[in-house]
Amino acid sequence: IVTKISFLSFEISELVKKNVGYFTQIIGPVLDVAFSPGEMPNIYNSLVVKGQNPAGQEINVTCEVQQLLGNNEVRAVATSATDGLMRGMGAVDTGAPLSVPVGETTLGRISNVLGEPVDNPGPVRSNTIFPIHRSAPAFTQLDTKLSIFETGIKVADLLAPYRRGGKIGLSGGAGVGKTVLIMVLINNIAKAHGGVSVSGGVGERTREGNDLYMEMKESKVINEQNISESKVALVYGQMNEPPGASMRVGSTASTMAEYFRDVNKQDVLLFIDNILRFVQAGSEVSALLGRMPPAVGYQPTLGTEMGSLQERITSTKEGSTTSIQAVYVPADDLTDPAPATTSAHLDATTVLSRGLAAKGIYPAVDPLDSTSTMSQPWIVGEEHYETAQGVKQTLQRYKELQDIIAILGLDELSEEDRLTVARARKIERFPSQPFFVAEVFDGSPGKYVSLPETIKGFQMILPGLLDSLPEQA
């Protein structure tokens, strides 16, 4: 009996030590919590609600403080469903921001925004935990070395080459192939890549997350027999989850990648699909918090939120982070604030075209809209640069002639222009290639094409060495 009493008194004293607040208002994922005077939690502190409601329903909700309202109240946003929460229930201030396990034990596993595993093999046993809100590296720590990151995708390697340790955006509307291209890059790069990869599913379809997981198991990037030999960590905050999860899952993925870069001094690949869902989640949260949106409807803090995520994704003298991000373009409008704000942070932009997808040319990459800061002769070399410029000039001339062809017909063009059109049509089709991840759809075995092979192919088309061949060849 004495032992039981002492144990109970210990439990009560532990509860007294905790900083507990009580819900005063619950509006969907937004929660108002009142604390004792002088006990207000800091911005970004996580609050935890555990226990049972009067109906006997188990409650386990983590939320993040977003605003200090005054009168000892804070406003927090939940990272999971708030079903079963009631006014008057207690929420414990953890005294720290959301923190997640990092390190080798996360490889081969699927985690949620809190770093909790959502797959079968049991808990993630890690001795190291990092907060998800971290500062970007100092200027003196940044690495400015320039080198090309070969992908095996012809059109990207030639016309908009990716920078090793840079940020790359795959921009396009709905259904033009962004996620397939992400999976191709994971397949082409992650298997040959010496370091590790982290993939963040930000507000995307659960089916796509499952497809990616299965694809990685098949290609042995995730090793089910020996999970410690896996090369990728997956972090998902899917479409059915509250905006608080989608808004922070990018930060969780970045935190896991930073451990491998800064502590293990490795080269890391960070895949984010889709960056627009991060913006949309921020917009939802902003509206729920009562902030006044500007004319287009996005949050007034769009630039700050995007900058705080993107500036962390960089290369330091310890290791590099190469980030490949899918950027959904609403209504195919590249001037929309979300893709426009994202593109300001990118080293290369691969733009996917609905017109090319309609023609059945995959990957449907628009060679004239796609850009890269690496397309300089002193970086890629004179031969690569001259070939790329020749391709762009031929395609640009073809684009200018299309109105004339539509009105007057091909026969009204000069001999030189007819030749340009014939070569441009070959160039338009030449970047098309079968992918390993698309074998199930078209039955064609995938092809990895090296950069020298790509340059050689275009160099044969430009001067007319292949004029005798039909377009389909």
From Swiss-Prot:
Transmembrane segments: none
Keywords linked to the UniProt accession: ATP synthesis, ATP-binding, CF(1), Chloroplast, Hydrogen ion transport, Ion transport, Membrane, Nucleotide-binding, Plastid, Thylakoid, Translocase, Transport
The EC number(s) this enzyme carries: 7.1.2.2
Record field: catalytic activity: ATP + H2O + 4 H(+)(in) = ADP + phosphate + 5 H(+)(out)
Family of this protein: Belongs to the ATPase alpha/beta chains family.
Localization: Plastid, Chloroplast thylakoid membrane
GO biological process: proton motive force-driven mitochondrial ATP synthesis
Residues that bind ATP: 172-179
Name by which UniProt lists this protein: ATP synthase subunit beta, chloroplastic
Top-level class of the enzyme under EC nomenclature: translocase
Membrane topology, from the record: Peripheral membrane protein
GO cellular component: chloroplast thylakoid membrane; mitochondrion; proton-transporting ATP synthase complex
Record gene name: atpB
A Pfam match: ATP-synt_ab_N
CDD domains for the chain: ATP-synt_F1_beta_C (cd18110), ATP-synt_F1_beta_N (cd18115), F1-ATPase_beta_CD (cd01133)
Subunit-structure text: F-type ATPases have 2 components, CF(1) - the catalytic core - and CF(0) - the membrane proton channel. CF(1) has five subunits: alpha(3), beta(3), gamma(1), delta(1), epsilon(1). CF(0) has four main subunits: a(1), b(1), b'(1) and c(9-12).
HAMAP family hit by this protein: ATP_synth_beta_bact
Molecular function per GO: ATP binding; ATP hydrolysis activity; proton-transporting ATP synthase activity, rotational mechanism
Keyword Translocase appears in the UniProt entry: yes
Function statement: Produces ATP from ADP in the presence of a proton gradient across the membrane. The catalytic sites are hosted primarily by the beta subunits.
